[in-house]
Swiss-Prot record:
InterPro entries: Rbsml_eL15_core_dom_sf, Ribosomal_eL15, Ribosomal_eL15_arc, Ribosomal_eL15_CS, Ribosomal_uL23/eL15/eS24_sf. Residues 186-196 have a biased composition (Polar residues). One of its GO terms (cellular component) is cytosolic large ribosomal subunit. PANTHER family: LARGE RIBOSOMAL SUBUNIT PROTEIN EL15, RIBOSOMAL PROTEIN L15. Residues 69-100, 161-196 are annotated as: Disordered. GO terms for molecular function: RNA binding; structural constituent of ribosome. Residues 69-98 have a biased composition (Basic residues). GO terms for biological process: cytoplasmic translation. NCBIfam families: PRK04243.1. Keywords: Ribonucleoprotein, Ribosomal protein. This is Large ribosomal subunit protein eL15. SUPFAM superfamilies: Ribosomal proteins S24e, L23 and L15e. Belongs to the eukaryotic ribosomal protein eL15 family.
Length: 196
């Protein structure tokens, strides 16, 4: 049985540091480093992944590549007094993933669009790149789309900031149910951050 075009792309991206994709990625990163932190692009780098996550090549759908520094949080030393436990500066990580930060930054730049989903496209020693799929909720092509029309509802305003995207639900511990996840519902903060 003949394999689809998308299956070949998917197989190549399983090991991006090997084969032809490795050289292609090396060239891409040279260009990406010279670009801005948030760049709108014409078409997705990983077409198979983008299509899986809801991307369609139609009006009202936009893709942006976002770069975010790697590592933990960048905290400044407190000027006022604190007990030792609250004085920490180093070895502290954010309570959200870099992918979520990418989605939020893209959402802030394109305020009239809503984040549908995002996926990883590369990283080097100092930064990670994600491509964020954004949708225009007021575009007629989106409002009348059977697959994407739901995002036009007011319930989905500020999806990225409320942790309603795929990366957001994962970071909030909503992927699993049952034993061990009692403290993640209704939310992590609703249980005094005991669930995470």
């Amino acid at each position: 049985m003949a394999r689809s075009f998308y299956s070949h792309i998917k197989e190549a991206w399983r090991s991006p540091k090997e084969g032809k994709l490795a050289e292609l990625q090396w060239q891409r990163k040279q260009e990406w480093r010279d670009e801005g932190a948030i760049e709108r692009i014409e078409r997705p780098t990983r077409l198979d992944k983008a299509r899986e996550l809801g991307y369609k090549a139609k009006q009202g759908v936009v893709v942006a590549r976002v770069s975010v520094r790697k590592g933990g949080s960048r905290k400044q030393r407190h000027k006022a007094g604190r007990r030792s436990k609250r004085q920490g500066v180093n070895r502290l990580s954010r309570r959200k993933s870099i992918q979520r930060i990418s989605e939020e930054r893209a959402s802030r730049k394109y305020r009239n669009l809503r984040v549908l989903n995002s996926y990883w496209v590369g990283e080097d020693g100092s930064q990670k790149w994600h491509e964020v799929i954004l949708v225009d909720p007021n575009h007629p092509a989106i409002e009348n789309d059977g697959d994407l029309g739901w995002i036009a509802s007011d319930d989905h305003k500020g999806r990225a900031f409320r942790g309603l995207t795929s990366a957001g639900t994962k970071g909030r511990g909503q992927r699993t149910r049952g034993t061990g996840t009692e403290k993640t519902r209704p939310s992590v903060t609703g249980n005094d951050r005991q669930g995470k």
